[in-house]
Each structure stands twice: as C-alpha cells, then as structure tokens.
Amino acid sequence: MNEFINFDEISRETWQNLYNTSIAPLTYDELESIRSLNDEISLQDVEDVYLPLIHLLRLYKKNLEDMSYSKGLFLQKIVKTPPLIIGISGSVAVGKSTTARLLQLLLSRAFPKLTVDLVTTDGFLYTTDDLKNMGILDRKGFPESYDMEKLTSFLYHVKNGERFEVPIYSHETYDILPNQSQIIDSPDILIVEGINVLQNPQNQLLYISDFYDFSIYVDADEKLIEKWYLERFDSLLKLAKYDQTNFYHQFTKMPEDKVLNLARETWARVNRVNLREYIEPTRNRAEIILHKSENHHIDKIYLKKF
C-alpha cells in the first residue's frame, strides 16, 4: 500500500504558485540568525515553500475562529477562541528547529497584533539524574525518557488559556537547566517542536494529537538524515573545543577517527532506531509533510486529503 495514500503530493513548483508574493518579509541576516547548525535555507525557500504555508495556516486559524463563534451561537454564550497550536515533528538533524523558528517569525509578521510562542519538547525530558535513577539513561530521546504526562498537561493548560512554566533544556550541558523556565501565558499561536510531537502515550484519556490544530512533519531519506547528523556532530565538537562546560567538550580530546566512530555508533544504536520505531511511524498523522532532498532542499510537499 502507498504510505502516502491519504496525501496529495505537490511539487515545489506547483506549491509555490498557490500563493504569489513579491518578496519575503524578512532579511538574509534574520534568516541566518534562526538557522540551525548545519541546516541550509534561503530566502527563495521562504518565498517558494513557507509563504504558501503561512497562507494555509491563515485558513486554519480562520476556521478555528469560525468554529468558536458557531459554538458560541449554539451554546448561547461567548466562547473564546483557543490558541492555534501547531506541532512540528521529524528526526534529529532534519531541520525541525529551523522550520519552527522560521514559522514563528513569519507568523509574527503575518499577525503583528498576536502573540506567537515557541516551545521545544526537549524541556519535557526527564533530568539526567532522573534518567539514571530510572535506569534508562541509555534510552534518552526514546518515548519513555519524556514526561509525557507533563507535556499533555502543558498543552491542556495552554488550550484553556492558562499560564504554564516549561522547563528549559540545554544542548550544551545535555540536561534540564535547574531553576530556569520558559513562561507561556495565553499565546494566540503556539508552536510545539520535537521528535515526539506526534507520539501518543498509552493509557491516556487525552492524546497529544488532540491539541494540535495543524501539524507538520519534516521528512528526508534516512541516509541523508544520517549524513546531516554526522555533520552536525562535527560542528558541535568544534563549538565545544574551548568550552569545558559543554557536554561535547569531552569528545574533543579523542582522536578524530574514534569520535567519528562514536557518532556513527550513536546514530545506529539510538537515533536510527528511534526514527524507525517511534518517529517515522507518526509521519502520517501530520497535516503536511515537507520532504527534503540533498542540501535540505524541500522538493515535495504532501498535504493530507482528509
């Protein structure tokens, strides 16, 4: 069976003609400031791919507002429009973070009077100490290493317009930062980015996917993702070379061939397994799939039919 049977496959050329605009509403420097390590993105990508996507999100937001108004008429009371929640998923090193930050910037420009917040699910990882106590430190990144109950609670509070403090994760220390949090307080639009965004925990009355009004999966061939992962690992080592507080600094003392073997082993033992067993199987839950080819070039878009 065709795994994309429930999607319309749209070429980049067709997609870019669905919404015509003269210029991207951001500068090259702004785009560079939100680009993730080893990701590649251009102003042409913004115009060809992301501006039509923003236009589509406008339609989803309008639909959410119309539905809230209609419910209010039916219930004969004022029903406040809940925040539009957008989920972004995909493998490590595929470019989710760049997509999330770019959408936050573009949505802020498209809706200048609205609050657009961004949260990564890394903040819902258990701390390193907790993972050690649970005996699952070697499973970090897998579903059981996340506090899914807390993530679900967060989404519930946001949908109900309530304030919530989200833990902050540091890739430099490879752990949750103690006594630090990101405050999310009644945003109009919330973007949630992470590998587990579309995963549903077992035995829950509420599923994470229940809270999303729109979801995106950033996709690519597994071999390409592995290549990007190894390139990113190398870049992280270079950044950590003179920073002894950085988690990756410990690897800078090792011979290059051993470090490369370690990165390949980590990919094969952790990230590839996680991708095949837990991340990629959630792909078809997304409303839209952004497919990447070489150099992070988005060549195809899959839009869910129904």
UniProtKB/Swiss-Prot annotation:
It comes from Lactococcus lactis subsp. cremoris (strain SK11). This is Pantothenate kinase. Pathway: Cofactor biosynthesis; coenzyme A biosynthesis; CoA from (R)-pantothenate: step 1/5. The lineage of its organism: Bacteria, Bacillati, Bacillota, Bacilli, Lactobacillales. NCBIfam families: panK_bact (TIGR00554). SUPFAM superfamilies: P-loop containing nucleoside triphosphate hydrolases. Signal peptide: none annotated. It comes from the Bacteria. One of its GO terms (biological process) is coenzyme A biosynthetic process. It is an enzyme of class 2 (transferase). Gene3D superfamilies: P-loop containing nucleotide triphosphate hydrolases. ATP binds at G90, S91, V92, A93, V94, G95, K96, S97. The gene is coaA. One of its GO terms (molecular function) is ATP binding. The keyword rRNA-binding does not apply. Belongs to the prokaryotic pantothenate kinase family. Its EC number is 2.7.1.33. HAMAP family: Pantothen_kinase_1.
